[in-house]
């Protein structure tokens, strides 16, 4: 099992560099998605690690968007994170803002989940309920095909 900082320490590190509600909510969403995928894909023993990677994946984005995934290693080391977690976090920027290639299944899940949660979240905010709980998959597929909808979410990455 991989070493991981506590969730409390991860949240403190995240909040040190992120204050915007959107960024904090995105981090919490990706954390939950990563935990779910860890269990779903047979990595339940590593669910906390996967979730922490999801929580911290954009630690540097709010304050240093032009250095995204490049400033992260410094911030994560300062928070007590190990090399496995740092590599995983940086790998979600592969081909976009860094050259750290996702090699582990968890890193590939993060690569896609980051963009996908943005698309799903944008679709949910358009609904009267502001929730995914009553969203039909067909509605999401329709929005996915519209390149103008959530244009910042890379369909190629998804």
Segments predicted by a language model, with ranges:
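Acidic/His-rich, divalent-metal-binding segments that scaffold phosphate/diphosphate chemistry
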Residues: 1-64
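Residue-level signal for pocket-adjacent positions within structured domains
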Residues: 9, 144, 153
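Residue-level signal for secondary-structure boundary elements
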Residues: 22-25, 121, 152
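Divalent metal-dependent catalytic cores for phosphoryl transfer on phosphate-bearing substrates
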Residues: 43-150
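Short helix/strand-capping connector loops at secondary-structure junctions
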Residues: 151-158
